[in-house]
């Protein structure tokens, strides 16, 4: 895993919006920062909150904790729980088609645009 991180242009850490997941996320951030120091060039780190349930206190507090700890590294939105995506993953089937109107797919599209925008900004700064 370390060799892959050393060769990477970006580290994206998808993190379930639950308290226990925050421990693993913090470890991945520390590992990314260690790799960045050893390779002597930036390794942009992006944190993507996933499986977010806005109805629960644990989900809301976990999202706030991510934002407090990691600031602009955290996507300002979150991927909501989407049962169709979860069920399809369990069956190893494609979850959605282009015509699927679910909130989960729309959030993944916004996340992709955010990541691509971050990469474009990084390229502009490097030039």
Model-predicted regions and their roles:
Residues 73, 109-112:
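H/E-rich (His + Asp/Glu) clusters that bind or coordinate divalent metals
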